[in-house]
Structure formats: structure tokens, C-alpha cells
Amino acid sequence: MGAAGVIVLVITLLLGGCGFGAVQIAPYEPEPGTSGACAALSEGLPDVVSDAVRRDTEPAVPYVAAWGDPAVVLRCGVPLPAEYGPDSRLLEVDGIGWLPVDGEGGTFFTAADRAVHVEVAVPDDYAPEADVLADLAPAILDALPARNA
């Protein structure tokens, strides 16, 4: 295969999500009043997070995004998790306060200091998880104001 063929193959893989099918997501309804902010966030999300290429989701909805395999999954307009309380210690990554909650095979991070909450499920394969959160921070900061702003 010549150089042009390799370039076409690489572009095809990048645009096609590296050949992975769509990420199956559990349907949910975003919190009332969050759809506009979530749509704005979706517009600004990066194509690559921690070297993982963005993938389609099934169903395709504007408040969910996914990258890589295993998939990093972002859900916008979620409620704060039950683990959140007034004394919760947040993990600060690039200007966003995240509440980490351990799950099977990874960690769920919720942007608890935003007016609209975002959850990012990060599989253990992506350690350090802060790299994923740092890649998402600019889009979140642009689209979602701080909770008390």
C-alpha cells in the first residue's frame, strides 16, 4: 500500500471511530431545564479525549457523547449522585470540581460545581483519569456556568 493509501486508511479509521460500532447507552431524561446547556456543551466537545476518538452512541442523543473502546461516556443534565453531600470533597481538575464515585471497572466523575451537572464514566483503562477530565474541561467551562455564578 502506498503512502496515499495509508493516509486514506488512517483518515477512514479516524472518521469511522476506528471501526467500533456505536456505544449502546441506557436511555435517560436529562434534568428539566438543562437541554439548552447540554446542546451547547455537545457542540463544543472534542473529537479526541485522552487519545480516544469520539464514537457514535445508540440511541443518538445530544446530551450523551462517547470516546474510545472501552468507551468513556459523558452524560449531560444528570442529577447529583446520592454520594454527594455538603461535606463532599471534590477533585479539582482544570477549574472544575468533580465528585468521584468508584464503580465496577472504572470511576464515575460528576461535575458537581456546575449549574448543569455532567457525569463522565471513565474506565480503569484510562488512568490517570484526570487526563480525560482535563481534555473535557474547556468545553464544559465554555458551556456550563458555575453553580453559584
Where are these regions (language model features)?
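Generic alpha-helical structural element
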Residues: 7, 27-30, 34, 125, ...
